[in-house]
């Protein structure tokens, strides 16, 4: 594997360096910072949507019963 090329622009490098210049070195870190910020934003949006989804179903279960509750149990009807 030939490592004599800049990882940012593809220009030739000296001594097997990853970057051909300090500008490419800074550009590479700028890309990483932008990607990290983007990932954090997506992650927080995802967490918000999940929490809203769970809160919706929690509210729904608190306001309406899935099954009607009988006034008397079967035990009461049999032994009354």
From Swiss-Prot:
Pfam assignment, any one: Ecl1
Protein family membership: Belongs to the ecl1 family.
GO molecular-function term, one example from the UniProt record: zinc ion binding
Originating organism: Schizosaccharomyces pombe (strain 972 / ATCC 24843)
Keyword Plastid attributed: no
Primary role: Involved in chronological cell aging. Extends cell viability after entry into the stationary phase probably through affecting the Pka1-dependent pathway negatively.
GO biological process entries: conjugation with cellular fusion
Triggers of expression: Up-regulated transiently when the growth phase was changed from the log phase to the stationary phase.
Protein name: Extender of the chronological lifespan protein 1
Gene Ontology CC entries for this record: nucleus
Subcellular location: Nucleus
Gene from which the chain derives: ecl1
Keywords, comma-separated and alphabetical: Nucleus
Presence of the UniProt keyword Nucleus in the record: yes
């Amino acid at each position: 594997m030939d490592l004599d090329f800049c990882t940012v622009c593809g220009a030739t490098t000296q001594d097997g360096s990853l970057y051909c210049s300090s500008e490419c070195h800074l550009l590479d870190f700028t890309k990483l910072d932008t990607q990290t910020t983007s990932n954090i934003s997506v992650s927080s949006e995802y967490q918000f949507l999940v929490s809203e989804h769970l809160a919706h179903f929690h509210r729904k279960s608190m306001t309406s019963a899935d099954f009607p509750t009988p006034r008397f149990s079967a035990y009461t009807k049999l032994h009354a």
